[in-house]
A protein has these predicted regions:
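Conserved ABC ATPase "signature" region
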Residues: 29, 44-62
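Conserved ABC ATPase signature
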Residues: 66-70
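Hydrophobic anchor residue at the start of the ABC signature
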Residues: 80-81
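Conserved catalytic motifs of ABC-family nucleotide-binding domains
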Residues: 87
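Catalytic Walker B motif of ABC-type/P-loop ATPase nucleotide-binding domains
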Residues: 91-95
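Helix N-cap at the start of a conserved alpha-helix in ABC-type nucleotide-binding domains
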Residues: 102-104
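H-loop/switch region of ABC-family ATPase nucleotide-binding domains
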Residues: 127-128
Length: 147
């Protein structure tokens, strides 16, 4: 890894834990076992689920590309696919739309909205922008400086 790439990783804050340059599909698959890295080989059905989520987030065509060579937006989308791959009951998202272009912001908002509409699903989402919040939320906590 060159100095420029290491610098870019430190600046992005998203990928430092993925210093092994694994294919994007393996990064998504690591979400099946909540691990950083892929230590247990997923079976064909699990890999199909990973590819499905990558398709939902619009990055299936990048499944074999080295994760660290993806753009920051593509990395974000792959990591979001990783978060959803296990169909969690509780999903915690920290600024999931950060760094995405308008098209992908819209795409991710729709996916988040669909997740929030499902029964027995809970999501905690951190954002600086109220317009990024799903319309289906039932509770909101706003933090304001000095209050």
């Amino acid at each position: 890894m060159g100095n420029q790439e290491a610098y870019r990783l430190r600046q992005s804050g998203d990928a430092p834990c993925y210093l092994k340059n694994l294919p994007a599909i393996e990064i998504v698959a690591s979400g099946l076992h909540d691990s950083i890295g892929l230590y247990k080989r997923p079976h064909a059905g699990q890999m199909a689920v990973c590819e499905w989520w990558m398709d939902i987030f619009g990055v299936a065509h990048l499944k074999d590309e080295p994760f660290l060579q993806l753009s920051s937006g593509e990395q974000r989308l792959a990591l979001l696919a990783r978060a959803f791959v296990k169909d969690p009951e509780l999903l915690i998202l920290d600024e999931p739309l950060h760094g995405l272009d308008t098209y992908n912001r819209r795409r991710v908002r729709k996916i988040i909205e669909a997740f929030c509409r499902r029964r027995d699903k809970t999501m905690i989402m951190v954002t600086h922008y109220e317009n990024e919040l799903p319309e289906t939320i039932t509770h909101r906590l706003s933090l304001t400086r000095n209050r």
